[in-house]
UniProtKB/Swiss-Prot annotation:
Protein name, per record: Fe(3+) ions import ATP-binding protein FbpC
InterPro entries: AAA+_ATPase (IPR003593), ABC_SmlMolc_Importer (IPR050093), ABC_transporter-like_ATP-bd (IPR003439), ABC_transporter-like_CS (IPR017871), Mo/tungstate-bd_C_term_dom (IPR008995), P-loop_NTPase (IPR027417), Transp-assoc_OB_typ2 (IPR013611)
Reactions catalysed, as given in the entry: Fe(3+)(out) + ATP + H2O = Fe(3+)(in) + ADP + phosphate + H(+)
Gene that this polypeptide is encoded by: fbpC
Main localization, broad class: membrane
Keyword Acyltransferase: no
UniProt membrane topology term: Peripheral membrane protein
Subcellular location: Cell inner membrane
Subunit structure, as described in the record: The complex is composed of two ATP-binding proteins (FbpC), two transmembrane proteins (FbpB) and a solute-binding protein (FbpA).
Organism: Photobacterium profundum (strain SS9)
Length: 351
């Protein structure tokens, strides 16, 4: 086992009766990194988390933590902690006792428990609130207590099971920042599960996208968005306008509109016909252009931070996302589009 691969799943399968939920999965998490499992409901991401935790046993395959085979090891012996979607706090205990519960189970000295609990409450900005009870604090504060309860045990691995799904948008944003800051500060190897792409991108070093119990693609958030490996990935990672076009002689030809090919986009690609994807933010509208660039503006929706614009170009409806400085309210229904070469990706027709 390589030293920097702290959590490793090797050829893991999980079946419930005749239903295969995880199919020959290989996964590696480097020490101190945060890896997120992202995917639609039923893709198997939560099952993987439960396998790492020891809440489920694999049908076949092996699981290693810190070089040790823990495939058949109980959850109590794995030195991991989990932060749940439901918080799982004890309503009859004070916040102090909730955070210190695991330490008491370890029968640590009272003075050490007090110091570690006080430190943990300070980390999550809840100092001085230890004597309150769960029903006296907000949902965001409850999630901070759940996080403090995990951190106070100083686990080898920290697991997050959709921890922010019960919070409103502003609290989710704040808690994303808190989780990422504390994870990096303490260099805790972490596995995070969510169905929210924005959340995954905000907290992760690496994102692993799953579908039907298998890994579809993994990489940095930037890599997954800019270079999807399949049509599923292209659409799952955000809106995409898909064309049939050609890469030839350093240019991309889409509906007769020739665009200089960005070297990073076409790196390793042979010349030929492709499915060409263009992200909505890579298309701009102007009042002048070549005939091949002419389009019809069908609809404009103000979204606060941006405008979503629907246009028809060569009988195909496209989605554009323009910020306020890019959108001209005086633009006529007949406009011209330009495409930023860096917002393009190429896929073979069988992807």
């Amino acid at each position: 086992m390589e030293n920097d691969n702290f959590v490793v799943l090797k050829n893991v399968c999980k079946r419930f009766g005749d239903n295969t939920v995880i199919n020959n999965l290989d996964l590696e998490i480097k020490k101190g990194s945060l890896v997120t499992l992202l995917g639609p409901s039923g893709c198997g991401k939560t099952t993987v988390l439960r396998l790492v935790a020891g809440l489920e046993k694999p049908t076949s395959g092996q699981i290693f933590i810190d070089g040790e085979d823990v495939t058949n090891t109980s959850i109590q012996q794995r030195d991991i902690c989990m932060v749940f979607q439901s918080y799982a706090l004890f309503p009859h205990l004070s916040l102090y006792d909730n955070v210190g519960y695991g330490l008491k189970m370890l029968k640590l000295p009272a003075a050490e428990i007090k110091q570690r609990v006080d430190d943990a409450l300070k980390l999550v900005d809840l100092s001085g609130m230890g004597d309150r009870f769960v029903d006296q604090i907000s949902g965001g504060q409850q999630q901070r207590i759940a996080l403090a309860r995990a951190l106070v045990l100083k686990p080898k691995v920290l697991l997050f099971d959709e921890p922010l799904s019960n919070l409103d948008a502003n609290l989710r944003r704040s808690m994303r920042e808190t989780i990422r800051d504390l994870q990096q500060r303490f260099n805790i190897t972490s596995l995070y599960v969510t169905h929210d792409q924005t959340e995954a991108f905000a907290v992760s070093d690496t994102v692993i996208v799953m579908k039907d119990g298998e890994i579809m693609q993994q990489g940095s958030p930037d890599d997954l968005y800019k270079t999807p490996s399949s049509m599923f990935m292209a659409n799952f990672m955000g809106d995409a306008n898909i064309f049939t076009g050609r890469y030839d002689d350093g240019q991309l030809n889409i509906n007769g509109y020739c665009i200089p090919a960005d070297p990073e986009v076409v790196q390793g690609k042979a010349e030929g016909d492709y499915q060409i994807g263009v992200r909505p933010e890579a298309i701009l509208l102007t009042s002048e252009g070549e005939p091949s660039q002419q389009c019809i503006v069908n609809n404009v929706v103000y979204m606060g931070s941006m405008y979503e614009v629907a246009v028809t170009w060569h009988d195909q409806e496209l989605l554009l996302q323009l910020n306020s400085s890019q959108f001209d309210a005086n633009l006529s229904d007949h406009a011209y589009l330009t495409i930023n070469p860096t917002g393009i990706f190429l896929l073979p027709f069988d992807a």
